[in-house]
Regions:
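Short, structured segments at the rim of ligand-binding sites
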Residues: 1-370
């Protein structure tokens, strides 16, 4: 354990959005011609490396130099695909319905923690379409039609279907059988497909129409990541001021909501010129619905520790099925530091303003907790 002293303040540049990068890389692999993806980190994190390795295994050619990735779309269709997703849920869930449309049989290699996460909504759906679908393998093509699926387990299921259905020769409909959570990630997938010539549209509240479009090469730039920035913004609300540069004020990333959450809590928030600055104010506890922004829960918890009164984080039941049970992990580790926090099935309540102390904490093999 490393102990730091002092009050966090200053300026930091947002890292590139991994959510956008995953989608751009897959779209480029599925597109005709050579695409260019700019603004990536000079050293790819493990989950983006997993996606890069997998699209190469699918038959795409890729060259990475500095912060730019050049991808030439898939032009070979191997009989057997072996896709090592490591611990990347995005890689696995986005590529799972795509893979059988590329090759004869796809075999997935997953980390133990990723293997334990649910995939039944997708495997059962594909089985109903005549595909031999198991958690670690999938084979058999499928055609256009209606694809009913739950919207409250993982938005990545819907994003994977959007990518796959764009490859088919007829129109398809994704019909949500339960309310959609984390809608912004689905919108990010739709926007990524649109950048490569794909087309989809909402038909009411529960159906997405996906039109057949041959994806074309594109030149795109990955924007800054609001999810990663949320921790620095929370630090600014407590200690600050902290400025995060490289953020698009018009971004469709759902986790941009961290700015409005901190504003509601009483922090001073300024956005302009591609940067966000958060300064301390008199923080107060609030209720936060994280059904569309579950990845903000750790950062909200940090700000809540310094707020007067109770902060209630709710509608985040899916947090229990991430890389770890994040609700339990947040509660357990903050209690080690002296926090007054109670778990709920779908969130937690923090009574802030108490005195904290140092402690040895565990990361639970989860980068959001670390």
């Amino acid at each position: 354990m490393t102990r730091f002293s002092g009050r966090p303040h200053g300026s930091v540049t947002a890292i590139p959005s991994k959510s956008a990068a995953h989608r751009y890389m897959i779209c480029a692999a599925l597109a005709q011609g050579r695409s260019v993806i700019r603004g990536l980190p000079e050293e790819l994190p493990d989950d983006l490396t997993a996606t890069l390795d997998c699209i190469r295994a699918l038959g795409a050619a890729a060259v990475f130099r500095d912060d730019t990735l050049e991808i030439t779309g898939i032009n070979a269709k191997p009989d057997v695909l072996r896709l090592d997703c490591r611990d990347s849920g995005a890689t696995y869930r986005l590529l799972y319905p795509v893979a059988p449309l590329i090759g004869g049989r796809a075999e997935f290699m997953l980390s133990p923690s990723l293997s334990a996460r649910p995939m039944e909504p997708v495997t059962e759906l594909l089985k109903s379409k005549g595909v031999a679908a198991e958690k670690l393998s999938v084979s058999g093509s499928f055609g256009p039609g209606e694809f009913p699926i739950r919207g409250d387990v993982s938005s990545q299921y819907i994003s994977g279907l959007l990518l796959a259905l764009s490859l088919l020769e007829g129109e398809s409909r994704i019909r949500l059988t339960t309310p959609l959570q984390s809608k912004s990630y689905v919108e990010l997938t739709r926007a990524s497909l649109s950048a490569f010539g794909g087309e989809s549209q909402w038909m009411g509240q529960d159906t997405i129409l996906v039109k057949p479009r041959r994806l074309k090469a594109a030149d795109v730039t990955v924007e800054g990541d609001y999810t990663h920035a949320s921790l620095f913004l929370a630090a600014g609300a407590v200690y600050g001021p902290v400025t995060v540069t490289g953020l698009d004020p018009g971004s469709i990333q759902g986790d941009r909501a961290m700015l409005s959450i901190l504003d509601r809590m009483g922090a001073r928030v300024d956005m302009g010129g591609g940067s966000a600055t958060v300064s301390p104010g008199r923080l107060r506890g609030i209720d936060v619905d994280v059904s569309d922004t579950p990845d903000l829960a750790p950062a909200i918890a940090l700000a809540a520790l310094a707020a007067e009164g109770s902060t209630v984080v709710k509608n985040g039941g899916r947090l229990r099925f991430k890389e770890c049970d994040r609700i339990s992990a947040i509660a357990t580790e903050l209690k080690r530091l002296g926090a007054d926090i109670d778990e709920a099935p779908d969130g937690f309540t923090i009574r802030g303003g108490g005195k904290l102390h140092g402690a040895a904490c565990l990361c639970h093999n989860d980068h959001r907790i670390a």
